[in-house]
């Protein structure tokens, strides 16, 4: 292992000189061990990642933690490889930082644990799956109108308090219970409080045992925030490639990954590109997204929360992300105000998988008819607000009546929210979802009151609820 010396510290950027031409490779992890001035203080270890070879035996590195206490002249050791993180079943139920160190104050991991490098190549063409397969989530509105592809990338849009976290938890629960699948949650540059809340909520709802969590929050240096998504992805890839699992990878928030890359780029002295972003924006995003895919042995399906700066969808950060997405799930505050959960907007949410070739003719026909009906209802709402229902034609009255039933039937109770709602959660297979909506559109249930459709799973549950309301079914 070659050794060098710190010759310059500029915030999170550290320059290191190696004598004798033994320069570390780009992306190699370097380690500085030092003690602070306090006598009782333990030895601190700082990991650096090589970003540029400057010449004259000097490399410029990015720190993965605070550089407080680092001084010129300190010894730096080249580990000889990129950052490595723990992988395998021991990661489940645990919380890690960007370096793969546990931060949940639980038992330390065994020393002989398998570790993988965070910088890896995307799967080659011959390793990729050639079939297109739907990932059944058990959530009606998602499965019917914006289905997820195995190995696909889904963008999750929504403001504060509209149910992003609950939707994420339910997806983790359903994948674990129905598919025996693993989930990895990567908190990238978001609030520490939210990560803490999510951890305890997942503990309470019982899904933590099938989940590995990785955090690089917004108080950490840009190096940690930029690399933590790769740490989460590396853990997910192991379950796909070695355990042959279908893995869900949640990234919250993908915009912060880009933002951290922009900060690092500026610190390294690169010329900025459009709107001040790094010139390598598309390359960095592509390197991350291309590793998220289906292979012959398993899949990594990614659900990425996306913050849109100033609601400008043409901003280079979200625009670059959109190029990689297969589906979008939009959460709408107006639906939460009506008590419709999950508050997924059925008209704004889209999916590349919603085509007759992938989901089948019947599913496609039912989904497009549901969207047409809801679009007509939306167009009529202004007329209803001004003139009332009586001014509508009989055909439009029927459309509105059915659309309201459809809208309520798109809601359902979640397993992870049972402790708050007192209502049992439901998982609805795609076949039953399609059949239920097909019968509903055909007018089979026009006599059932609207309220019977609210927050239920299968169509049988609607009929059961209607009976309890004293309606003949």
Swiss-Prot record:
It is a peripheral membrane protein. It is found in: Cell membrane. It comes from the Bacteria. ATP binds at residues 158-165. PROSITE patterns: ATPASE_ALPHA_BETA. The keyword Mitochondrion does not apply. One of its GO terms (cellular component) is plasma membrane. Its main location: membrane. It catalyses: ATP + H2O + 4 H(+)(in) = ADP + phosphate + 5 H(+)(out). GO terms for molecular function: ATP binding; ATP hydrolysis activity; proton-transporting ATP synthase activity, rotational mechanism. Its EC number is 7.1.2.2. Pfam families: ATP-synt_ab, ATP-synt_ab_N, ATP-synt_VA_C. Keywords: ATP synthesis, ATP-binding, Cell membrane, CF(1), Hydrogen ion transport, Ion transport, Membrane, Nucleotide-binding, Translocase, Transport. Belongs to the ATPase alpha/beta chains family. F-type ATPases have 2 components, CF(1) - the catalytic core - and CF(0) - the membrane proton channel. CF(1) has five subunits: alpha(3), beta(3), gamma(1), delta(1), epsilon(1). CF(0) has three main subunits: a(1), b(2) and c(9-12). The alpha and beta chains form an alternating ring which encloses part of the gamma chain. CF(1) is attached to CF(0) by a central stalk formed by the gamma and epsilon chains, while a peripheral stalk is formed by the delta and b chains. Produces ATP from ADP in the presence of a proton gradient across the membrane. The catalytic sites are hosted primarily by the beta subunits. This is ATP synthase subunit beta 2. The lineage of its organism: Bacteria, Bacillati, Bacillota, Bacilli, Bacillales.
């Amino acid at each position: 292992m070659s050794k060098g010396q710190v010759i310059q510290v500029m915030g999170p950027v550290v320059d290191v000189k190696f004598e004798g031409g033994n320069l570390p490779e780009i992306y190699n992890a370097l380690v500085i061990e030092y003690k602070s001035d306090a006598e009782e203080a333990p030895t601190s270890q700082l990991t650096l990642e090589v970003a540029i070879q400057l010449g004259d035996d000097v490399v410029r590195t990015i720190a993965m933690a605070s550089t407080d206490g680092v001084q010129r002249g300190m010894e730096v050791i080249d580990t000889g490889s990129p950052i490595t993180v723990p992988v395998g079943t021991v990661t489940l139920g645990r919380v890690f930082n960007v370096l793969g160190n546990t931060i949940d104050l639980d038992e330390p991991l065994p020393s002989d644990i398998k570790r993988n490098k965070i910088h890896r190549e995307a799967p080659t063409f011959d390793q990729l799956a050639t079939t297109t397969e739907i990932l059944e989530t058990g959530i009606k509105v998602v499965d019917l109108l914006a289905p997820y592809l195995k190995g696909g990338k889904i963008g999750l849009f929504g403001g504060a308090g509209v149910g992003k976290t609950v939707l994420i938890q339910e997806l983790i629960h359903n994948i674990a219970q129905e598919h025996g699948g693993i989930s990895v949650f990567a908190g990238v540059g978001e609030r520490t409080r939210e990560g803490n809340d999510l951890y305890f909520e997942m503990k309470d709802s019982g899904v933590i045992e099938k989940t590995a969590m990785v955090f690089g929050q917004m108080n950490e240096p840009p190096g940690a925030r930029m690399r933590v998504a790769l740490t989460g992805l590396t853990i997910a890839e192991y379950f796909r490639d070695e355990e042959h699992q279908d893995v869900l990878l949640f990234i919250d928030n993908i915009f912060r990954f880009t933002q951290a890359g922009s900060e690092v780029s500026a610190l390294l002295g690169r010329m900025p590109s459009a709107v001040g972003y790094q010139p390598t924006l598309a390359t960095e995003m592509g390197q991350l997204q291309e590793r998220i895919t289906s292979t012959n042995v398993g899949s990594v399906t990614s659900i990425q929360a996306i913050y849109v700066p100033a609601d400008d969808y043409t901003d280079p950060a979200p625009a670059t992300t959109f190029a990689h997405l297969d589906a979008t799930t939009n959460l709408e505050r107006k639906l939460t105000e009506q008590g419709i959960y999950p508050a997924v907007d059925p008209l704004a949410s889209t999916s590349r998988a919603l085509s007759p070739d992938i989901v089948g003719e019947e599913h496609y026909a039912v989904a497009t008819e549901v969207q047409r009906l809801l679009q007509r209802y939306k167009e009529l709402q202004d007329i209803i607000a001004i003139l009332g229902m009586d001014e509508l034609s009989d055909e439009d009255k029927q459309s509105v009546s059915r659309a309201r039933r459809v809208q309520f039937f798109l809601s359902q109770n979640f397993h992870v929210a049972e402790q708050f709602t007192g209502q049992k959660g439901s998982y609805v297979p795609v076949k039953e979802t399609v059949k239920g909506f097909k019968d509903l559109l055909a007018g089979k249930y026009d006599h059932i009151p609207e309220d019977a459709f609210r927050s239920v799973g299968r169509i049988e549950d609607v009929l059961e609820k209607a009976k309890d309301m004293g309606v003949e079914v």
